[in-house]
Amino acid sequence: MTQIIEVDRRLAIEEAAARVIADPANSRVAARLLAEEIADEAAAHGVRTFSESIAATHAAGLIQDGLAEFVAAHAAELDALVRAEADDRFEYFGLRTVYDRYLLRHPETRAVLERPQHFFLRVACGLSESVAEAAELYALMSTLSYLPSSPTLFNSGARRPQLSSCFLLDSPRDELEAIYDRYGQVARLSKYAGGIGISWTRVRSRGSLIRGTNGHSNGIVPWLRTLDSSVAAVNQGGRRKGAACVYLETWHADIEEFLELRDNTGEDARRTHNLNLANWVPDEFMRRVEADEVWSLFDPKEVPDLTDLYGDAFTRAYRAYEAAGRHVRQIPARTLYGRMMRTLAQTGNGWMTFKDAANRTSNQTGRPGNVIHLSNLCTEILEVTSDAETAVCNLGSINLAAHLDDGGVDWDRLRTTVRTAVRFLDRTIDLGFYPTPEAEAANKRWRPIGLGVMGLADVFFTLRLPFDSPEALELSTRIAEEIALAAYDTSADLAAERGRHPSYAETRAAGGVLHPDHYVTGTEQWDAVREKVARSGLRNSLMIAIAPTATIASIAGCYECIEPQVSNVFKRETLSGEFLQVNRYLVADLQARGLWTQQLRDDLKRADGSVQTIPGIPDDLKVLYRTAWELPQKALIDLAAARQPYIDQSQSLNLFMASPTIGKLSSMYAYAWKRGLKTTYYLRSRPATRIAQTTVQTPSAEAIACSLENPETCEACQ
């Protein structure tokens, strides 16, 4: 009988999930049924309470002794914290993600040994020093108001709690031993589910003389081929293959070959199919593109100081080397820029990140010699690196959609959430396991954190603000400022309680300059924060970074980070199959107007999730529910530029162009540079095939295709 009930329930779950396209309310129905199934599966292993879950996972060797002892000592209090009804907040696909990928399982039977609320409380206890602290963080997670990034969710309380999302490695020195040492570091970091960013700018270019052998170098490509194979071979904690992004400065003489690494044509021996690529672009290059001037390419062996310079110092040194004839060759700047745009158009890769903007305002670059050489795998982390220090960041994101009340943002609640999030992100620095000594040294000296957001599109839909409206720009900017104010204030409080980060004296904050001071006139609120920082210092050198959040946004049931929606109808994949999902805000509006019919659903799927050409949809809804492909990309750049004063690291900013051309891309990225953006992320383009004809009853119906090319993402940041 039990087996029959289980089969019936699974069929009911699949049926409800399949009906989400007709009515998004079916998502909650499917989620409740799945929650029952999870509870029964855990109960079959004797797990009904949180303390029983911890006992079972500890017996299975999955969690550390200290956590098991803490829970055993406070079992009654912790069991009483669990709110089983909080499972009702999940959408089906969010709960399915938790079940498939996050809940701890018995090593042999693979049955889950914790329920979703046990999972959240386990993560909270793994980061807490008391029951009260655990209750505080659990309250945020159980209401889906805030979630740490995936490494923390995977590993909090585990025997090896690798809690960090991102690792950034400076370029190896131009020596055989240094290069192979970097390979080893990357492998160890990738083994424990870290997303890797690495510069390769210091390594000599093709044709460079090797004095020890009197031969000539083959350049960076063979080294990157080896790195590519290593990254693919070392999978992340047994969950997926590793992921890395290589950064190269635009003056490196191998830049043109670098831009071809992801091409699908040409000599395969000079291609890398796993590495992501990013350009680390100085202002001098962009100025020469604007002026249609020549650009000089150098062998880093001949100009070893360029990689450690930025701003005016870089420009002076670059021009001096150029005047001295030290360049390998010259090329029209616009020709090279065009090749960069071609790489973006064809692969979505070769991301544009801006060296001078990244360094100019960073709190970490207050002392000469402290230089940011690259960003991370998702371009939202900007931290100082050196041979002795691998930059690290611990991430978490606030669900903005969970902070709405009475037709607006609940600012007091948002500030409270920020304060809690900052304290627990700081805690991860001390509790985390570090795969390399260089990572531990950097993280404990600088103590950077990356607090971000998700669900901005949900806020705009709820408040009926078109993404490119002046009101949306104003609200987005205020949200960023309020989060930064609360984060800096909290970090100053932590400094008073627990001490400043050890490198505080090297930062701009120690000289009285906070990140917003580089952009805007101070307000009374910032004056108060600045005074507190002057008294107490800061616990963390950096605080704000907007990560992609694809996975945790799915758990929270909101749209990713700061992005607009890609489509009003989209595919969700789970281990049990693929399902279509629909924009629930659009459906609610159409239902209220009596327009949500089967015919309209079919029209929406035929239109690739766009409402723009569907007859009968009111104009106000067409404006509000535009997709990323239908919004002016200038608006996305303007939103990012307006919030940047309050983001002391950076933001994962995808840009969207259905049919990219070199001319359009050239203008778009030049505009991003002029607006002072520090980084950009993927260029998203539509595939040639049509999207989403899945359940439309036509003889030639095709399975829904992914709406984005280049779907690789860094799970660590999510």
Segments the model singles out, each with a brief description of its role:
Residues 1-718:
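Extended catalytic cores of very large enzyme megasubunits
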